[in-house]
């Protein structure tokens, strides 16, 4: 089998993980206790169930008793959020050893997450990952969920990625990263954390799918009609993206996409590995359309700014690569027509050194939705991952915020007292300036 290990780090990573595994269980017909719903009865009633769970082993380990345990690890430096999972609806789905927490918080600082507090639990976390890896017959790689702005998400992840690169050097590492929003901030020192972690993980991460809270809030408010979106609503949106990206690993389909194929098709140069994500259709459960949207409709929606999960305007940049992952009632002929229509649009510009540009995945398993959730059930959906030079706008925004604080040496003492040096800040900022330049250069014509 080609198994994948999911690692959820910090408050954002853990809460996204909770939403992801809830959705995966619904998609595979797994109950909160880990057992598949009346397996034999289901097979007689619905022969698709057996086919549906043919590739289940990539994400779930089946015990002798027939229980399906997720191949995952949840980790936070303080216990509150992990305790929420220990007593939550899916508490019996996970083995207690898969839920790891420290005793004190990273206090929103990269330095505590990486050095002082993080270093105390890193060996335990690696030991638990080793145990999970030993249950795999052919480990394909790691999916790492975290935020750039938090202390644990930024600091501990950079320490872990470094160690994983040593112990599992050939295994692919894909990230789902919550990027600091332009206007909504959960911590004053987010720009420091984000730039330090980007610098320290850029060589260890193979591909990082970007989402940001502001774009997600806007989708919840404008598309789903939620006046005051909760983190639960936002995390379920991210879970839909994660599910679409991993669907071809978990279900059979006519055009499957392997983990390494994302890297091969989306990353033209090692450092340019930050694709933006978009999802369509996003329809509220209350306003569920009577007519279903066509393949062309959902494909066109993905190229609209309002369907993107990151605040940046792709019309201001050029696409280097684009991966379209379709689910449900979709046939290749419709996809080809939809792509041809998109290529003829002047607003969708590709760099001249990448003329084809589109990678396609098709999976017949329609998207599932959480009962009582915000999203409507649809027959077909598409998730778009696109590597575009427009993301440089997001990096430039972040760099500017970093510069404003660093010019006054504001909040630096929290990092220095944990053993960091000013040189690390300077080095990280220079690396990000180089990253901005890299993006500008790849967008240039010959």
UniProtKB/Swiss-Prot annotation:
Keyword Nucleotide-binding appears in the UniProt entry: yes
Where is the major localization of this protein?
cytoplasm
Q: What does the UniProt keyword field contain?
A: Cytoplasm, Cytoskeleton, GTP-binding, Hydrolase, Magnesium, Metal-binding, Microtubule, Nucleotide-binding
Question: Where found?
Answer: Cytoplasm, Cytoskeleton
Give the residues the record marks as binding GTP. Answer: 11, 78, 147, 151-152, 186, 213, 235
Which InterPro entries does this UniProt record tie to the protein? Alpha_tubulin (IPR002452), Tub_FtsZ_C (IPR008280), Tubulin (IPR000217), Tubulin/FtsZ-like_C (IPR037103), Tubulin/FtsZ_2-layer-sand-dom (IPR018316), Tubulin/FtsZ_GTPase_sf (IPR036525), Tubulin_C (IPR023123), Tubulin_CS (IPR017975)
Required cofactors, per record? Mg(2+)
Q: Which reaction does it catalyse?
A: GTP + H2O = GDP + phosphate + H(+)
Question: How does the record describe its quaternary structure?
Answer: Dimer of alpha and beta chains. A typical microtubule is a hollow water-filled tube with an outer diameter of 25 nm and an inner diameter of 15 nM. Alpha-beta heterodimers associate head-to-tail to form protofilaments running lengthwise along the microtubule wall with the beta-tubulin subunit facing the microtubule plus end conferring a structural polarity. Microtubules usually have 13 protofilaments but different protofilament numbers can be found in some organisms and specialized cells.
UniProt lists the family membership as follows: Belongs to the tubulin family.
Description of its domains: The MREC motif may be critical for tubulin autoregulation.
Write down what this protein is called: Tubulin alpha chain-like 3
* Organism placement in taxonomy: Eukaryota, Metazoa, Chordata, Craniata, Vertebrata
Q: Which gene encodes it?
A: Tubal3
